[in-house]
């Protein structure tokens, strides 16, 4: 993740963590994960982009483990015809970017920037500070 888009890691600190789930298929097994810290000196509200951070994590996982079943393929929120990731994101855009081995972070930036600017303008009248 650091190599492909270090700017997407700005505003937070990532730290390896280990945990032992108490239920489901990994119950009692030591698992590894990533903890996202946003409440210390590394936090920068203007720089932190959580959606991009998660997109980059998906992309890194797809790169390292191409055959890993990243996307849930069973009904989600009463949706029978769309994948959960597409429902959550409102389109196929994120999933298609992650699954495209040739796509780079700048591609996702260029696709999403217009919508982000429109959202910033639309919400600006409602911000109190």
Which positions does each model-derived feature cover?
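Flexible, low-complexity junctional segments that flank or bridge functional domains
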Residues: 109, 113, 117-127
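Conserved functional hotspot residues or short segments at active or partner-binding sites
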Residues: 1-109
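Generic, ordered loop/turn and secondary-structure boundary motif
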Residues: 89, 127-129
